Regions:
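Jelly-roll (double-stranded beta-helix
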Residues: 2-301
């Protein structure tokens, strides 16, 4: 915790999780029903694990509160994850680049593009597949698993597609707004939020695409924490007291409350932009805000 001697208060905690400290998985193509790679130096999948998962076992980095999995996946064209099962997780997939085609045992089949969110309550059990069916475009998505408030829920699927959502919603800014937070996911029990995705846990997903030299604030309640991912570009995170962490593409950051004070503001400043799908120059951040759990987060940094 940072102590500000001029104010006599404890500032919020920022823990940088650099991309170099993420486990990068490049599994054998046969694991998910893909043929051998045509180019040996390029694997069909490159997956960055923010928490312990699959062949990456690290008891010092197992979760962040109710966030159990966050994988940053890049899938080559004409490749994907064959049919496999899940149970007792809220699974949220945010598409960054390309198109994701989903099929499941509930009869759902859908293709979603950049800025879309796919979500599943795996509950009692569901089988699904995820593929990049494009011939020459890579697919990047962020998939997060959240522990539900109880096991054995009835499985269900849903999605948010910004190309169509605005046609039927009063909250049209959520589809196209830049330089402001887009609140995409909230708790089914939260009656105060108007989000396109609702899950069975006290967790919120916010995303923002920011132009050059833009600044954006987020107000944290003193009993909340967040995990931030820099999806594209570069940003500075600055606390009320001026403490700063710089994030570049693939970097993460744990944000935790300080002690002895109420709400605090975290400022996000664009310091580097990338040309993204669609042609815009952007810094792009994703943030899961959840209930604070003492002792959460990486213990090996």
């Amino acid at each position: 915790v940072f102590f500000n001697h001029s104010t006599g208060i404890c500032d919020m905690q920022l823990k940088h999780v650099p991309a170099s400290r993420l486990f990068v998985s490049e599994p054998d193509p046969s694991w998910f029903g893909n043929p051998p790679n045509e180019i040996p130096s390029q694997n069909w999948l490159e997956s960055r694990f923010h928490f312990s998962f699959a062949e990456y076992s690290n008891r010092l980095n197992s979760n962040f509160g109710v966030l159990r999995v966050m994988n940053d996946d890049f899938v080559q064209p004409n490749r994907g994850f064959g049919t496999h099962g899940h149970a007792n997780m809220e699974i949220i997939t945010y598409i960054v680049q390309g198109k994701l085609t989903h099929k499941d045992s509930m009869g759902t089949e859908e293709t979603l593009g950049r800025g879309s969110v796919q979500f599943m309550t795996a509950g009692r059990g569901v089988q699904h597949s995820e593929f990049n069916l494009e011939k020459d475009t890579g697919l990047r998505f962020i998939q997060t698993w959240i522990v539900p408030r109880r096991d054995g829920l009835f499985p269900q699927y849903g999605s948010f597609d910004p190309d169509h959502y605005g046609e039927k919603s009063r909250n049209r800014n959520i589809c196209t707004a830049r330089n402001q937070w887009r609140h995409l996911v909230s708790d089914t029990q939260d009656t105060s939020s108007d989000t396109p995705v609702r899950i069975e846990q006290d967790a919120n997903l916010f995303v923002a695409e920011m132009d050059a030299d833009q600044s954006l604030d987020f107000l944290f309640k003193n009993d909340r924490m967040a995990y931030v991912l820099c999806v594209e570009g570069s940003v500075n995170l600055i606390t009320d007291s001026g403490n700063k962490v710089t994030l570049h593409r693939h970097d993460g950051c744990e944000v935790k409350p300080g002690g002895g004070r109420g709400d605090m503001t975290l400022t996000f400043n664009t310091i580097g932009s990338e040309q993204v799908e669609g042609g815009d120059l952007s810094a792009h951040v994703l943030m899961f805000e959840v209930d604070h759990v003492e002792g959460s987060g990486r213990q090996d940094l």
